[in-house]
Amino acid sequence: MIENDNTFNKDEWEIIEKNYRKGGFSKISKAKKKNGIINGTIVNKKMIAIKKIKFDDKIQFNEVNNLELIKNKNKEMQISSIIDYFGYGIKGKNKLYIYLEFIEGKTIYELKKKKFPLNEKQISIILKKCLETMKFLHNNCNLIHMDLKCDNIILKPNNYDNNNNNNNNNNNNNNNNNNNSNINDDNNNSNSNINDDNNFDIKIIDYGLSQKIGDLKRDHYGTYLPDECILNNVSIVNYTFDVYSLGFISFELFYPTQFEIKPIKLTHIYEYVEKSQISPLFLNFIKKCIGRYLDIDVLEIHPFLNENYDNFENYFKFLKQTPLKRIKYRNGINGENDILRINNSTTITSEQFPNNSKMIEFGDDFNGIINVDYIANKKVVILNNPNYNIINLDFCFSNVEYICIKGIGVLEISKITHNSLETFIYEGEFKNDFILKPYLFTNTKHLILKNYKNYIRHRGIIPEGVTFLELSDSIGIEVIKTFIHLPKSIEELCFGCTEETLKQIERNLILQSINFFIINGKLMKFSKNNNLEYYE
């Protein structure tokens, strides 16, 4: 609820501390409303953060609109990491004042400057709370934060409110200098309280750059966004922007000093994090965020974020089922209205296809001709019959991001030359002398070739960027010896072989960057003696 008169009147406020925090576009002061009421909401003597922004045509009320939306959506959800919003005021032609909940605590950036250490358990708690907030923003508000970073995450000890209220009651007559001293003392105390692992909460702040999923990307963007976003190779806002940012936040949380991460190639990022002294599970989580091929539902159950670190089996069972779920999530495919199923042989023209359908599935009994126009604008395509007649196959998949092909005849896969496929599942056959060509999967991250058991003859056959690779369930040891040519981006490798072959697999045959293996349907790892063994 916003008052009719939104004029900011300084006389109505008691300024406790002016400009105690500054951002790129704003200054924040600590204050109390003298009459205890803000836009009809009774706040009594509650401390308020007044965010002052000099707005222009590009920023204007974007943050106000986002905060209004988030506030309304959070009434039912009650996500604790969402900051309370009380309205706004305007002064002059270009000064906007936003009234927010004042959070006692320090940003992660401030803690890092003081070289305050965080262990991996504390980091996992922080990241889990971040994911909860991201999931709420994405699913309930249809918003991407766009500027997730350590400076926009405040750590607040859970017992801080009571201590702060007592301090405020005892010190109402203190001057600003005394208040500043108390704040610093309190925050120093808060650092020790954070050591109690789960005895703290987080608040994610600053929604000035947030945008709706599917919007055109604006000129303003946050600190940690993908290279393709900064270099204007992508124009549509999607959830992977926030996931990517979380990967850099994860890495920074481990180190007590602030450093600048400039846009660099993905392979260089992998090499950098692999040299760091962090656990394999934490490293795996970071690489998944930076790789951007998992959605939040999958990241939430990652073993690093859960106390049961050994629960790998359920994690990987879920992982193998996620490609379609992920692409649905990303493209807003929420129900049957978004999915078009063709389950008969009736002749269909492209004009009969609804424009709003985002996914198309051709059933086993469809034996008509599939024209390029049918699937040109679809994000998800599922072909269940190996005998489809597809016209212009080489241009069919220019915009498709997920495809599952049961088979289009031997070698027909080689005709797919222009694609943006992130997830490719192919269950067709390969000739014995067939060699994969890297141009087939230039943008693919999740690659499943269920019948491929030929040699990986040289580096580049599987392109850099693939993170999940599944091959045939009958791989021989000579083919496994060529796995050394797989790209360093691969994190999970899935294949099958005989028990005799399994005994011959040595650590030097598999890239060190591959953390986990699913062999014959079971999760395996190399022991300290470099022998393959099952996870128990």
UniProtKB/Swiss-Prot annotation:
Source species, domain of life: Eukaryota
GO biological process: signal transduction
Cofactor(s) it depends on: Mg(2+)
Catalytic activity: L-seryl-[protein] + ATP = O-phospho-L-seryl-[protein] + ADP + H(+); L-threonyl-[protein] + ATP = O-phospho-L-threonyl-[protein] + ADP + H(+)
UniProt enzyme class: transferase
Keyword Cytoplasm: no
Residue numbers binding ATP: Y20, R21, K22, G23, G24, F25, S26, K27, I28, K51
Entry-linked SUPFAM superfamilies: Protein kinase-like (PK-like)
GO cellular component: cytoplasm
Protein name, per record: Probable serine/threonine-protein kinase DDB_G0268550
Taxonomic placement: Eukaryota, Amoebozoa, Evosea, Eumycetozoa, Dictyostelia
